[in-house]
């Protein structure tokens, strides 16, 4: 996977965390930079870990589905992208918010980080079938998520839940586009090989 594809994938995967961070930022009385950075750090560490877990699972099963690797990556990306779009549209303009605390609890942030990183784990499964440096890719995903979640917290109270919803929709569309790109690249190479 190219450098630019890795950045685009990381940006797409960080949109879930960004959308949640916007919502979390909107629920805080006044989000401070330290709280935003803490949220970004927690989300980033989790988001960097889950693709590696998924990648390891993918390697374990790769011998059974190597002929369909491009279809697996395509299917996972389309399903996850579609799920992001569906959940965003289903939720509507509502932001799942609480009363305005001064800061969010660590356990709450960890649970939210895990929930938003399940798509990254599934992507990791798909990445096991591609020639990627998983550590570099996971670090890029984690750093992008940290940056986006931190920014989301800081600007959440100003832009509210509407942009958070649009960010999720855009992230879903990008994942679907990457899935089609992987499929078309593989099918194109397959056609030239025969």
UniProtKB/Swiss-Prot annotation:
InterPro entries: Mntp/YtaF, Put_MntP. Its main location: membrane. One of its GO terms (molecular function) is manganese ion transmembrane transporter activity. Keywords: Cell inner membrane, Cell membrane, Ion transport, Manganese, Membrane, Transmembrane, Transmembrane helix, Transport. Coiled coil: none annotated. The chain crosses the membrane at residues 3-23, 40-60, 65-85, 109-129, 134-154, 169-189. It is found in: Cell inner membrane. It comes from the Bacteria. GO terms for cellular component: plasma membrane. It is a multi-pass membrane protein. Probably functions as a manganese efflux pump. Belongs to the MntP (TC 9.B.29) family. This is Putative manganese efflux pump MntP. The gene is mntP.
